[in-house]
């Protein structure tokens, strides 16, 4: 079933790739490819893994062209896809304005395919709506994460916060202004009175400890939590033979 299903959808994906897809079209393509990655994780004997990997590489090359063709216009115009620095105005501020409490959870380095493996568990606890947005360039942590909390493109927040430019040269300082960025953005959105709780979690043990005390912060209007240990694992894997043996490929990472 997995074999016949993918072979049928293979041509549909190829057709969409050749149709100059919009951002919404690219999201549809990406979802289809991730779906088959997860399917083949469970049915590794299909013999189609290499074909899927080649199709993903082909899609990546075409997506790069999509970014190259559009990015310079997106950074100066309003007619653009939703991007990560739109997160607070679009996803958070409206709920705060309605008087709702919000928990903003940023899982650094968690990919969409990783998230999809958690969906079964999460759906039993939450009503889930996935609203995609486009990463900024560079997509590295110092730029993308700071963009989320500042609500600005990197050149904009570097101009507004010149001390951040110097901090970016130091590995331990690249994201030390995030709480300030978020507070300032809330003020610009007329949400200065929001009670904010901001927390960074670097290790699993810290996460477990935080979980046991999370009730202390439930009176906050906005809980913003950054989880770093997925990103740390990703970087450590490239330097550790033990981790490479434990997580030999993308399937193992999921």
What are these regions (language model features)?
Residues 1-102, 109-254:
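…; additionally, a secondary subgroup of soluble metalloenzymes is captured
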């Amino acid at each position: 079933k997995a074999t016949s299903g993918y072979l049928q959808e293979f041509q549909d994906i190829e057709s969409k790739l050749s149709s100059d897809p919009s951002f919404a079209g690219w999201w549809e393509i990406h979802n289809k490819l991730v779906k088959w990655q997860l399917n083949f994780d469970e049915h590794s004997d299909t013999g189609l893994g290499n074909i899927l990997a080649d199709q993903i590489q082909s899609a990546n090359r075409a997506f790069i062209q999509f970014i190259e063709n559009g990015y310079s216009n997106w950074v100066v115009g309003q007619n653009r896809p939703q991007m990560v620095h739109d997160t607070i105005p679009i996803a958070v501020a409206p709920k705060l304005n309605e008087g709702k409490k919000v928990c903003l959870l940023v899982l650094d380095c968690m990919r969409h395919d990783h998230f999809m493996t958690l969906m079964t568990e999460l759906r039993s606890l939450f009503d889930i709506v996935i609203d995609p947005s486009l990463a900024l360039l560079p997509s590295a942590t110092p730029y993308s994460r700071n963009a989320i909390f500042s609500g600005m493109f990197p050149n904009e927040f570097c101009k507004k916060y010149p001390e951040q430019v110097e901090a970016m040269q130091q590995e331990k300082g690249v994201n030390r202004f995030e709480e300030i960025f978020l507070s300032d953005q809330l003020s610009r959105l007329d949400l200065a009175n929001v009670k904010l709780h901001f927390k960074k979690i670097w290790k699993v043990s810290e996460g477990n400890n935080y979980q046991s005390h999370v009730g202390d912060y439930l009176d906050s209007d906005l809980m913003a939590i950054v989880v770093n240990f997925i990103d740390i694992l990703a970087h450590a894997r490239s330097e550790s033979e033990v981790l490479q043996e434990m997580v030999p490929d993308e399937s193992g990472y999921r």
